[in-house]
Swiss-Prot record:
Lineage of the species this protein comes from: Bacteria, Pseudomonadati, Pseudomonadota, Gammaproteobacteria, Enterobacterales
Organism of derivation: Salmonella enteritidis PT4 (strain P125109)
Family of this protein: Belongs to the ureidoglycolate lyase family.
Protein name as annotated: Ureidoglycolate lyase
Designated gene of the protein: allA
GO MF annotation: an example: ureidoglycolate hydrolase activity
Record-linked Gene3D superfamilies: Ureidoglycolate hydrolase (2.60.120.480)
Highest taxon, organism lineage: Bacteria
InterPro entries from the UniProt entry: RmlC_Cupin_sf, UAH_cupin, Ureidogly_lyase, Ureidogly_lyase_bac, Ureidoglycolate_lyase_dom_sf
Cofactor dependency: Ni(2+)
GO BP annotation list: allantoin catabolic process; purine nucleobase catabolic process
Known pathway: Nitrogen metabolism; (S)-allantoin degradation
Length: 160
């Protein structure tokens, strides 16, 4: 099956998480007016007594064509990825309680200046780079037992 890749924007992505970007976002000045602060762009959630981690993930480009056959989710915390090199990247998401609901399966491509924050329990494809090795600033929950993985029927990404 083919899965069309759509441009990433907050309106179409909102059911799955937050788009982390400055475009069309409010800000206020700090540091004597030298800095524009784009405040509270994503809601970071960590359940239980675990802590929030900030890491850098270096992702390798996916083999082409990009084929999706499994999704994962994190029930105990959100997970954010922000590309550090200005590279566009692809995110693949779905809703669903026990298993991904294929009717909600979507693929998006960022513009290189956007990151994403997946809501808790949102099914998504494991992180990969699109065209070149990419470093991602990653914010997520520390601790174990926070990853469910499900196989899905194979979908091939279709770039419009």
């Amino acid at each position: 099956m083919k899965l069309e890749v759509l441009p990433l924007d907050q309106k179409t992505f909102s059911a799955y998480g937050d788009v982390i970007e400055t475009q069309e976002r409010d800000f206020f000045h700090i540091n004597n007016g030298l800095v524009e602060r784009y405040h509270d762009l994503a809601k970071v959630e960590v359940l239980e007594q675990d802590r929030t981690l900030i890491s850098i993930n270096r992702a390798q480009p996916a083999a082409m064509p990009i084929v999706v056959h499994e999704l994962e989710r994190h029930p105990l915390g959100t997970q954010a990825f922000v590309p550090m090199n200005g590279e566009a990247f692809v995110v693949i998401v779905a809703l669903g309680d026990d298993k991904p609901e294929l009717s909600t399966l979507r693929a998006f491509i960022s513009n290189g200046r956007q990151g994403v924050n997946y809501h808790r329990n949102v099914w998504h494809h494991p992180l990969f780079a699109w065209q070149t090795v990419t470093d991602f600033l990653t914010v997520d929950r520390g601790g174990s037992d926070n990853c469910d993985v499900e196989s899905i029927p194979t979908h091939e990404l279709c770039f419009a």
